[in-house]
Amino acid sequence: MAFMIAQRAFLKLYLIKMVEERRGYGYQMLEDLKAEFKPHGYLPPQSEIYRALHELVQEGVLYRTKKLKGNDPSVDFQEIVLYHFTNDGKEKAELYRKQVKTDLDRCLGILHKAEHDNFGYS
């Protein structure tokens, strides 16, 4: 059992949420996560975002499609990769979410104990 939740597990949790909310493609997810966590001193590495997305595809949670970024194919050549749930991906995502919740609760317990024992906070 790990001491704290793994970074990739943490990122996968957020990526699943973003796909549920249809919040864009890989690079957009990266930028959104950076903006969301920057105030907390955490900038998720690009490599970890794409590894996490790749794992979710390999695990059958997500599949990807490609499309042109703009609306005019005569001038828009940049292709983006969009992520979607597979047929049983939402169920797999929910199971994954429950597993990560258990780990998060354990980690929070450890952190709260350390905070209480060393700083007197409860």
Please report, for each region that a protein language model flagged, where it lies by residue.
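A detector for short, charged/polar N-terminal pre-domain segments
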Residues: M1-A9
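Short capping segments at the starts of secondary-structure elements
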Residues: F10, M18-Q28
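Basic amphipathic alpha-helical segments that dock to polyanions
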Residues: I49-E59
